[in-house]
């Protein structure tokens, strides 16, 4: 587990929602969960792929960018977790470069030398990599590099340093679950639980009453995962409908259902799911 940084809190919340014991003190580096037969080690996010790839740990949560930067052949991504999204881009002074080919032979500063080296090698571009441990946006101003390659969320930090993004994205990154070469015992359960959390975060439950003659039209508006549950009401001309709907856009779905003739439309949270 990430011990700190942007991935740590959300990863811990996700494991808690999946039914696992988490640490109570942010300084704790080890937590045992005997009920689920799992041990959690809290490590630097950058080191997690190394531990998993070497076989010291069975699975881990880290960033896709950190996994690729580690270049550990024994570690691989098995599930994207839907948080910690970012892109990996090149940046330089405005107008200095416009294409990746122009980087050939220049100095590029980055905190992800493994990732950048692999990417540029695939493109047939040779650069003089300048490895730094963070805050790479200052490298151009200080004369250490001609360009930088770094994780970008909004681009504000790069713009404040007088840099502009150029070239294609190196990578779309997010938090991922990684595993080693062998599938450890309990991985299937962990995956099923985490996928249940992802479903619970992405969907809500919608309940509404509707004239029975309008069911087909309502299902076209909100089809659900497989098929809605339709139950009879005391009034034989009306039915109760329950359906899972994507959280994003649910208010538009409610508006459409109401316009169709549905009433008593309720939306409730899903706390856990198995599909």
Language-model-detected regions and their locations in the chain:
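Signature of uroporphyrinogen-III synthase
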Residues: 50, 87-91
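Small-molecule-sensing regulatory modules
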Residues: 1-38, 62-87, 95-275
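Short, structured active-site "lid" loops
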Residues: 37-57
